[in-house]
Swiss-Prot record:
EC numbers: 1.11.1.7
Cofactor field: Ca(2+); heme b
Catalytic activity: 2 a phenolic donor + H2O2 = 2 a phenolic radical donor + 2 H2O
Protein's job: Removal of H(2)O(2), oxidation of toxic reductants, biosynthesis and degradation of lignin, suberization, auxin catabolism, response to environmental stresses such as wounding, pathogen attack and oxidative stress. These functions might be dependent on each isozyme/isoform in each plant tissue.
Name the UniProt record assigns to this protein: Peroxidase 6
Entry keyword set: Calcium, Heme, Hydrogen peroxide, Iron, Metal-binding, Oxidoreductase, Peroxidase
GO terms of biological process kind: hydrogen peroxide catabolic process
Cofactor binding remark: Binds 2 calcium ions per subunit. Binds 1 heme b (iron(II)-protoporphyrin IX) group per subunit.
Family affiliation: Belongs to the peroxidase family. Classical plant (class III) peroxidase subfamily.
GO MF annotation, one: metal ion binding
Entry keyword Iron: yes
Amino acid sequence: LVSGCADLTALAAR
């Protein structure tokens, strides 16, 4: 889950 969360955050940060 953490991995998915980080991935989403990176996408949102973009």
